[in-house]
Amino acid sequence: MEKDTEELELENAVFGNINNFSSFLDKENETFDVMMNEAPELSEDNDAQEDELEKLEDAELFMFDTGSADGAKDSVPLDIIAGDNTVKEDEEASNEIPSIWEDSDDERLMISLQDHSRLRKLRQYEDEDMVNGLQYARRLRTQFERVYPVPEWAKKQDVTEEEDEFNALSEKSVIPKSLKSLFKSSVSYINQSSKLLAPGTINIKRLKDANFQAPSHSGIRCMSIHPYFPLLLTCGFDRTLRIYQLDGKVNPLVTSLHLRSSALQTALFHPDGKRVIAAGRRKYMYIWDLESAQVQKVSRMYGQENFQPSMERFHVDPTGKYIALEGRSGHINLLHALTGQFATSFKIEGVLSDVLFTSDGSEMLVLSYGAEVWHFNVEQRSVVRRWQVQDGVSTTHFCLDPSNKYLAIGSKSGIVNIYDLQTSNADAAPKPVTTLDNITFSINSMSFSQDSQVLAIASRGKKDTLRLVHVPSFSVFRNWPTSATPLGRVTCLAFGKGGELCVGNEAGRVGLWKLAHYD
């Protein structure tokens, strides 16, 4: 059966046409013959090279690299094998940018290129073996740049003298010195903790107890934060001063000092951070020099012994110049912090409850048990102001924020009044901006955070009695502490500079929490 026209066309499209293929092959052969005729000299050279290679022995065609230079009679340059990309060491050394730091041992260091198979590619001659450290580093760099060439954007651009002068002139005229000082460092100048803290709930997490590595054998009576470093000082009736490093993970004990003759009531870091002042219910106190490890005993206040039965309660002004001792019958005695010598004394009417200094040390505030506040000028030894706490009775403790704006006064009934000293009239008694009644037991501990946004108030009259107050809104955080928060009977409080909250209790533990807002 003969194939019709449609079937033949389909067969040619799928399998091709043998006649067309033969004619195409003949045309290709003719083209190849023409090219060979046009280049007769090239073909003769190739034939000559093939004849020469056929006459060579197999041993002459190949070279076995054994890694040793003993059997090598002639040193064949390996630059030929590497090609034109090989850079001579002398040229490369001259083109290198001078290093900022150089190691003198690099020139004395000798490295063998024959012992390690991976280093043989760095040789320039077959029998080359030992190179110094500088040559070795230079060849490694060259080998790397062969595989990964330097991109155009990383190459140093040639700057003409005119462009250099123009850039220097524009830099001097546009960028002032103050901006240049900022650009020299990569330190962040934005303080994330300066943002306002939101009221209502607080994000807080518990860390390992601050004194976990070396717990106290008695209740914690007083705590103090180092003015410059994350260090915590604790003291108690076990007669031991302990300093811990607050890292939140281990909190290691840095050092400790045992004073056999005094059950300690108060211990504070001096504002210079180099000394610790401690005292118990005795007529003397100790000044511990942390740098020299020397302990100085201060005693015998001449002329004031009758009004100072003990030195167990004292305060150090922020300038580090004076130590204020709480005495009997409303007396406050000031000592020179460096020498321990008596400086002067102040007196109020009634029973003394608490003493504090303003942040600049210019004024001393004294609280009486009869709900009266006295302002003294320290240098002039005079009364600046005196006012009565509104609806106050049996005031026990007060606290001033670092900005000298808010004054919190606690009472025996648990009421806490907060006053704004900067907006109040100096001639009249200030009015409280808010009154907190969340605690119904005597207030014995209060502390402001470093940015004055959080106020912690506590009482040891009942277990787990502590509240955190959002100062801008004067509201109590409702989510912390919870009924499961292990606080115990709180005896003292302290805020760290990084948002750490230290809580000491009668069981001798110092709980440590971290406010996430200050991370």
Curated annotation (Swiss-Prot):
<feature type="repeat" description="WD 2">
    <location>
        <begin position="71"/>
        <end position="111"/>
    </location>
</feature>
<comment type="similarity">
    <text>Belongs to the WD repeat UTP18 family.</text>
</comment>
<dbReference type="InterPro" id="IPR001680">
    <property type="entry name" value="WD40_rpt"/>
</dbReference>
<protein>
    <recommendedName>
        <fullName>Probable U3 small nucleolar RNA-associated protein 18</fullName>
    </recommendedName>
</protein>
<feature type="repeat" description="WD 9">
    <location>
        <begin position="485"/>
        <end position="519"/>
    </location>
</feature>
<dbReference type="GO" id="GO:0006364">
    <property type="term" value="P:rRNA processing"/>
</dbReference>
<keyword id="KW-0539">Nucleus</keyword>
<keyword id="KW-0677">Repeat</keyword>
<feature type="repeat" description="WD 8">
    <location>
        <begin position="438"/>
        <end position="479"/>
    </location>
</feature>
<dbReference type="Pfam" id="PF00400">
    <property type="entry name" value="WD40"/>
</dbReference>
<keyword id="KW-0698">rRNA processing</keyword>
<feature type="repeat" description="WD 1">
    <location>
        <begin position="26"/>
        <end position="66"/>
    </location>
</feature>
<keyword id="KW-0853">WD repeat</keyword>
<feature type="repeat" description="WD 7">
    <location>
        <begin position="390"/>
        <end position="429"/>
    </location>
</feature>
<feature type="repeat" description="WD 3">
    <location>
        <begin position="216"/>
        <end position="254"/>
    </location>
</feature>
<comment type="function">
    <text>Involved in nucleolar processing of pre-18S ribosomal RNA.</text>
</comment>
<feature type="repeat" description="WD 5">
    <location>
        <begin position="306"/>
        <end position="345"/>
    </location>
</feature>
<dbReference type="InterPro" id="IPR045161">
    <property type="entry name" value="Utp18"/>
</dbReference>
<comment type="subunit">
    <text>Component of the ribosomal small subunit (SSU) processome.</text>
</comment>
<dbReference type="GO" id="GO:0034388">
    <property type="term" value="C:Pwp2p-containing subcomplex of 90S preribosome"/>
</dbReference>
<feature type="repeat" description="WD 4">
    <location>
        <begin position="259"/>
        <end position="298"/>
    </location>
</feature>
<feature type="repeat" description="WD 6">
    <location>
        <begin position="347"/>
        <end position="386"/>
    </location>
</feature>
<dbReference type="InterPro" id="IPR015943">
    <property type="entry name" value="WD40/YVTN_repeat-like_dom_sf"/>
</dbReference>
<dbReference type="InterPro" id="IPR036322">
    <property type="entry name" value="WD40_repeat_dom_sf"/>
</dbReference>
<dbReference type="GO" id="GO:0032040">
    <property type="term" value="C:small-subunit processome"/>
</dbReference>
